[in-house]
Design a protein with these regions (language model features):
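Peripheral docking tails and interdomain loops at the edges
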Residues: 1-46, 118-194
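Short glycine-cluster motifs
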Residues: 17-115
Length: 194
């Protein structure tokens, strides 16, 4: 099912099989585990180039944020500018890097009761916005993780629908996104050999 959703939303590229991936989100340990899993799928989470690092560091992100790749942004970072900081981060990655794919992952439960604002609408807006600002530049996937809380699941359904309407495949876990990207890469490699 992961692969079918990816093919429904993304067109395989014959000229550039997917290998280089940027992970961006609030994960901590999740990002580390995902990096290992992606590597086992032959998807590289390599450090970003100096130009990208400089652009991200120029955003003056709060302490605790790592921008090397994965771009690990704690909740307080993603709450900056009411979540609009995600748009600036994505813009910096798109304008200074050439990843084959970007996977944005958000743990919805981590935002619950953390601060006076809920940045999720603006985080989703940032994901949707890059589809029109940088069309075809990199495959883009969204991972929305939750703990099964009914209210969170309702919000997750709403965010999933918005993303899908913009052509963004949405997964429950990073491993699902990695498997989908692997399927895309296999088709791209086949097309490249035709």
């Amino acid at each position: 099912l992961e692969a079918l959703l990816a093919f429904q939303c993304m067109a395989p590229r014959a000229d550039r099989p997917t290998r280089r991936v940027v992970l961006f989100g609030n994960g901590g340990g999740t990002s580390v585990l995902a990096t290992d899993f992606f590597a086992r799928q032959n998807l590289s989470i390599d450090p970003l180039a100096d130009e990208a690092l400089e652009a991200l560091e120029a955003l003056d992100l709060p302490p605790g944020t790592s921008v090397v790749n994965p771009i690990d942004t704690p909740v307080n970072t993603l709450q900056a500018q009411e979540g609009r900081i995600a748009g600036a981060i994505l813009d910096a990655v798109y304008t200074t890097s050439a990843p084959d794919a970007i996977v944005m992952h958000l743990n919805l439960a981590a935002f619950l009761g953390r601060g006076p604002i809920d940045p999720m609408d603006n985080l989703i807006n940032a994901a949707v916005s890059v589809q029109t600002k940088f069309p075809g530049q990199a495959h883009f996937m969204l991972v929305l993780r939750s703990d099964g809380d009914p209210d969170l699941e309702e919000s997750k359904r709403t965010y999933r629908a918005r993303a899908l309407d913009a052509g963004i495949p949405v997964y429950d876990e990073l491993a699902n996104a990695a498997m989908a990207l692997t399927a895309i890469r296999h088709v791209e490699e086949h097309l490249d050999n035709i």
